[in-house]
């Protein structure tokens, strides 16, 4: 199970530059849940560090701020990429997917995001490519 989660997360991070094709429910859910858990672990670790360790962390972050910004940018781009590819699996174009998911901050976007997690994609090829292995 952990190996499978690691593989799907790594696949999303490697395909961060490619918002075309289709992503299965499993790939979308594993990537989003993994990034959420890792972000919560980092925040919890920072919150409970003693003050003398925080100074070391600030020095490290200041020294490697360009690298940390690049890592954060790759994670964010990978999130958008897997979101668009999941929308392609359900037949939505990239603009429609990004617009509907950004409504999450407002009123009805949570319904669309729930649909991305729950609705199964088609097992047939569509205009965005062949079906992912999990849909067949």
Language model region names:
Residues 27-53, 58-83, 90-118:
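Hydrophobic alpha-helical transmembrane segments in multi-pass membrane proteins
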Residues 1-34, 80-95, 114-136:
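Membrane-interface extramembranous regions at the lipid-water interface
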